[in-house]
Regions:
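N-terminal secretory signal peptides
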Residues: 1-44
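Functional cores of ribonucleases/endoribonucleases
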Residues: 27-99
Length: 99
């Protein structure tokens, strides 16, 4: 459950800080899938209705694809999320992003 583990924005990898800034400014995002609905099928994040969570790619240097790093944010309006979570292992674990 992502409720306990946190990570400060300043402690995210630089690519994560960049993605977080893009989320708050509403893009533009480099990947087509950025901003798509995240289903929370793993049920590691607090349970919410479908469409509440959206996922964004955190670039991984030298990865040939989108890599395993993501930021998932929840809320009514994508650029003013209620909460965002960072995963470095493709949704196996999450840490809540704090200021």
């Amino acid at each position: 459950d992502a409720g306990n583990a946190t990570v400060a924005v300043a402690d995210l990898p630089s690519q994560g800080q960049q993605t977080y800034r893009l989320i708050l400014q509403g893009g533009p995002f480099p990947h087509d899938k950025d901003g798509s609905v995240f289903g929370n099928r793993e049920r590691l994040l607090p349970r919410e209705r479908r469409g509440y969570y959206r996922e964004y790619t955190v670039e991984t240097p030298r990865a040939r694809d989108r890599g395993a790093r993501r930021i998932v944010c929840g809320g009514q309006r994508p650029s003013t999320p209620d909460a965002c979570y960072y995963t470095s292992d493709h949704y196996s674990s999450f840490r809540k992003i704090v200021q």
